Amino acid sequence: MMNIDGILKVLPGVKEPKAAVPFNKRLMWTFTGLLIFLLMGQIPVAGTAPAIFERLQAIQMILGSKIGTLATLGIGPIVMASIILQLLVGSGIISWDLNSWEGRARFIGVQKLLAFFFCFFEAAAWVLSGALTPKLPHLALLLIFQLAIGGIIILFLDELISKWGIGSGVSLFIAAGVSQAIFIRLFSWYSINQMPAGEVPRLLFALTTGNLQLAAQALIPILSTILVFLLVVYANGIKVEIPLAFASFKGFGRRWPLNFF
């Protein structure tokens, strides 16, 4: 364990703020981290052969990734490291006291170390499995290195937002990926077979051409998206009140509201 602690001390990371960070600075760092993440999703990795990743669209939204770019790995290494370490600690295979400062610090450090490992492991898996194909065989190592570096940058961005920004970087990246996908599918004016790809432009196109069947097909996804959004907002506001009673104060009780979801 001493060897692990020695490794954790030399791990690179984002420095903790020494004082409370003002809200405007937290907002600035959150926006900066999100902007860098979105830009990474627009930078293709060098040496990869062109391919179509439509079958992997669901994975992209779940992992907050953009396959074929520096953001190919997304939050995958962070989530994988967290799940494995929580299972090991929760099952008692690794006996760390997470109630102590030392135990929590060791947990966070080892989680980061595992995330570094999974950046290279998942990058190699993407390339060696054929999901990302290099243009030439000798470019495979270069492709793996680029994907791993992209995953490490996302790891630091998550740490930056968690310490200096607002909320969690992982949640923000997932929300950004889902929001971007919804926005593009709703409002894209890119034409496919002389027809807009986005549902809203397609609806306008159908109404102007008098094609009611096409208008109905475009309207259903729009209404479904709005309905799901309203249901999520409503469900997020549902609270369950738990009655509490105190043995030391007979006759005194209160209700404790908890979020249902």
Each model region followed by its residue ranges:
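Core subunits and conserved enzymes of cellular information-processing
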Residues: 1-260
